[in-house]
């Protein structure tokens, strides 16, 4: 399963959901922060280097969130049988959340740490190339521009991925459409609802 949704579209909830229904471990940006190999893989990819996706995802059965979502087209071509899930959220709500959490963190990270820790420098160079810098033309703080990029991404995914391979899913949709799409039983427990905004406060 390939997640094509931007960060802050319920990706952490989707990660937990996929892991509960047999698609774990699920790759997420958290992996890139804690795993040096993952940092290196996605840094190289962001610099235009060819990476071995089989090696990158050898320990995972699904991937959601940035940075993997930035390569959804390449991954869909590499794994033609994989299904694609596009995390959905109201664009204004998404911007409000992203701009006060993950974007703020990426901008406020102490620059001196990047000078003394090479992995941290690579991590934030990757974020610049893959997440908030180039994809948003370095205008993420321009709300209207960022929301346009968000909406354009949604339309691109709908255009690129065949309808039968794509699920547009919001956390509020719960288990039913997700499980029907993946042809797995619906768990009895509630759909995961992970609101990690407080981590960035």
How does the language model describe each region?
Residues 1-2, 59-62, 82-83, 163-167:
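Short active-site oxyanion
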Residues 1-58:
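PAPS-dependent sulfotransferase catalytic core
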Residues 3-5, 29-30, 64-68, 88-89, ...:
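Short His-Asn-centered micro-motif
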Residues 19, 23-24, 31, 47-57, 70, 73-168, ...:
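PAPS-dependent sulfotransferase catalytic domain
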Residues 31-40, 85-95, 112, 152-201:
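The conserved 3'-phosphoadenosine-5'-phosphosulfate
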Residues 52, 56-77, 81-84:
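Hydrophobic/aromatic-rich structural module bridging two neighboring secondary-structure elements via a short loop
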């Amino acid at each position: 399963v390939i997640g094509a949704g931007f960060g802050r579209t319920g990706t952490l909830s989707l990660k937990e959901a996929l892991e509960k229904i047999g698609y774990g471990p699920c790759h997420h940006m958290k992996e890139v922060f804690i795993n040096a190999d993952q940092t290196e893989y996605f840094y190289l990819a962001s610099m235009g280097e060819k990476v071995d996706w089989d090696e990158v995802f050898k320990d995972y059965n699904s991937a959601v969130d940035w940075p993997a979502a930035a390569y959804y087209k390449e991954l869909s071509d590499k794994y033609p049988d994989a299904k694609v899930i596009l995390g959905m959220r109201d664009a204004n709500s998404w911007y409000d959340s992203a701009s006060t959490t993950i974007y703020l963190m990426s901008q406020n990270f102490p620059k001196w740490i990047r000078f003394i820790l090479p992995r941290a420098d690579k991590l934030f160079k990757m974020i610049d190339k893959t997440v908030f810098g180039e994809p948003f033309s370095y205008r993420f703080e321009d709300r209207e521009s960022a929301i346009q990029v968000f909406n354009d991404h949604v339309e691109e995914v709908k255009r690129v991925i065949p309808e039968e391979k794509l699920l547009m899913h919001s956390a509020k949709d719960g288990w039913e459409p997700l499980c029907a799409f993946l042809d797995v039983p619906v768990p009895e427990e509630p759909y995961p609802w992970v609101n990690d905004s407080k981590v960035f406060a």
